[in-house]
Every structure is written in structure tokens, then in C-alpha cells.
Amino acid sequence: LKYTDDTYQAMDKEKQNRGYFVSFCIEQYKKKPLRTGGIARDWSFGYTPLLSRFAQNISVRVSGGAMATKLAAHEEALGQMLKIFGSGGRQNITLVGADGAGKSTVVSAFAEMLIDGHQGVPRSLLYQQVFMLDASSLISVAAGRGELENLVTMILNEAFLSKNVILCLDNAQLFFEEGVGSVDLSNVLLPILEAGNLRMILTMDDQRFLQISQMKPQLAHALNTIAIQPSTEA
């Protein structure tokens, strides 16, 4: 099933911009024949067409120490992440901090530890790959709430079935409130976070997180939060 880069490049700009490609992906995904014999071989080998189209594979970028991402100031946060994901509890982490505090840096450092098999990484996390989705980008390509809900649901399903993906939702606050440039998808995301079976990292602005927590205490209760403080290192 090919509906990623080749299909996208073949479409004219008008169709790309108005979300036609998202609708096309959804329809083709639904038509994909169901294979028997357990999890399809595609999935067991990490077949992730939607993630490949809409997300960045952070692990590929940082593998082999390609990026100097780890800062001493973030070692405690990284240790907490390993502990949470290595335990049997809810498999989600929310990195909370101000803009520029280093949330994305922490995600990159964590991805590097896993993909390069650093000492201290639990066996269950070794070589897991971190894919980052930007909430604002997803909102911009979907034609409406229904299409966005379908797209996010299928991406979550794809990540879960791949068995080797940790999904990072950057600027996640945009998915938990209504407003300009944001859409409340709590009805989609909250059950996933509460179940805790899909490993997810959320990054959220600290002030927006506080506001959302007050409005949605059930959501706040479902999240394992880690505060990220700005680094003073040069």
C-alpha cells in the first residue's frame, strides 16, 4: 500500500493544502486488507506509513551520537523517564516547562539513549524508536474535527501495533483545549492515556498545562508529569 511520499508529491499544491491528502490516507487505510495469522508481518517489522508521513523519527536523527543532546541538568528527568517506561504503570510521560526550557532536547536525549543502547536502559526499552508529532501541524492539515479525530486515532493505532514506537506529541496542549489553532481531542486521547498501554511522551507549556489541569482534573490524574527546568549550561 503506497500512499505516502510518492502520492503526496504527485498531488497538486491545492489538494495538498486543503487536506485532500489526509482524506486520501484515511480512505486507503480503511481499505487495507486484514491479514490473518496474528499481527501482520508489516507491523512486526515496524510498518508505519502514517508516522512516516506525519511524524519525525527522532531516533534516526540522533543515532550514533549525531546530536549533542544530553545535558547534565536533564539527567534527573531522563532517569525518571526510564523508570516510568520501565515499570508496569501507565506508559505515558508529560514533560512540562516553559518555552525554551529544553523539552525537545530531553526527548532527543532520551531517544538517543534507547536507540544506541546506553547503559542503564531497561531491556524492554532497548532500540525503541521515538516519533515526534507536532500538534499544530496535524491540526493544520486536517479538514475538520472528524477528519482530525480519525487521523489521530489511526496514528495512535499504528504506533501501538508497531510494538517498537514511542509516540511523542509535541505542543500537546493544543489537543486539550478549544481555541484558535487548537482542538480538544480529550475524547480520543484520554482513554488511551488512562489505559497506559501505548508509550507516549507529551510536551506541554507549563502555564497552559496548569490551566488545562484545572479544567480537566481527570486528564491531570492520568498523566505522569516531569517538570523541565531551563538549563544554565552553555
Where does each model-flagged region fall?
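Alpha-helix N-cap/helix-start and coil->helix boundary motif
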Residues: 206-207, 233
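Histone-fold recognition with a strong bias for associated Lys/Arg-rich disordered tails
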Residues: 1-139, 147-155, 159-162, 166-174, ...
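Structural beta->alpha junctions
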Residues: 140-141, 231
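Conserved small helical "lid"/interfacial subdomain of P-loop NTPases
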Residues: 228-234
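Conserved helix-to-beta-strand junction in the class I
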Residues: 192
